[in-house]
């Protein structure tokens, strides 16, 4: 405050009287965060570039770190209106105090008697699309039979959040898989209420999330699918790597994949066609979809369409495969008109055989996940490809080295090798795949480079590189070692097979 002096006219000789006038108190501004940034200069072990947070609304700040670190101990730099700042109630000297951002933290700005809170989220951005799934009530997914309702969001480019890059919808989700369902990192099946396009692929209601838990490279299925894409097989499932955030927690890197089913953009065999799976029947499953034939050890499952035991569709399918199986093992199976090629498509069987033999797919001896399709009026065709996470020598309970035949001993395939025409076709097609070795290696290298940040974040979540994971034969200790081992195995496999096929 200050004093002013009031005076009267000099004529009345009155003394001057001081008057107290209060100072004007400036209004305290509302505390406000202007910007929050992690500078690479302040965080050289974690960042290669500066990362600025996105202020959402008036209380949330979201970061996407462009590369992955083993921790999120970071020094922030802030521009703000206020006198002081705290992070999780710890006073912070912005630009010098390191804080742990592994979990959401509360940043509080104080100015006078006013405070303002911001919740800070630091996500590790790996370059992959990010998928959020929130089940109702955040209930755990515990069943492979019963779907749960959930909200769904898929952001293709989390850096720009461009309008066309975000898909939001409701979805139903359940568990899936056989041995993979028993793993710590679970695989899932997704079913939308209406057909949707995910990451540019043709619209459909049904999709799956493959966990790749047993495959530390996360490349085996993708590489086998690449072989399918360059083959004579009519359809190979399209897939993309994504990061899954399930019920608010990062759950690892998954392979979003088209579910195998009949459809115009999937297994295109028309309304009267069939999709079969030669597989070991799960104990307790209904008989309604299954039948057996004489020369296959496991049952044939009618995956699509829906059938009832003994109905017209079921009987047609059973008769079709039974007759084909019988003719394949008959005395006149080489007959050019009435022999096995009347019922089996030689091109698809040759390519399916070779892809599974080249990759040494443990499950493909007509025992597990062996798919076959039929279009009315046509022949039985092999495909689509499926289930390669323990292929490429990635098993400890079966032959795993790059030498030795494996799939050739599958019942139907072994019989087909008794036909010189099939042998000639296999040799011709093997030479084609052999000529594509450089393309295959480039594909592996490109995908490994694409996943270089994702695999570290996935490792931080699941800790598999230095531990035994069923049914791995080796523990290589790093992602680069895992990929290098796979490539060396595949090169050796190609060379061994070439030598053997050249002898035929």
Regions found by a protein language model. Give the residues of each.
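Conserved oxyanion/phosphate-binding beta-strand-loop segments in alpha/beta enzyme cores
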Residues: 153-211
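Beta-rich interaction/scaffold domains
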Residues: 9-129, 133
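Middle-to-C-terminal accessory/interaction subdomains
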Residues: 179, 183-184, 303-366, 370-373, ...
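C-terminal motif of bacterial Sec signal peptides marking the signal peptidase cleavage site
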Residues: 4-7
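Internal "kinase-insert"/substrate-recognition segments embedded within catalytic cores
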Residues: 189-197, 204, 211-213, 232-237, ...
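Regulatory N- and C-terminal appendages and interdomain linkers associated
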Residues: 9-43, 106-108, 120-170, 442, ...
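Short, well-structured beta-strand/strand-turn elements
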Residues: 83-87, 231-243
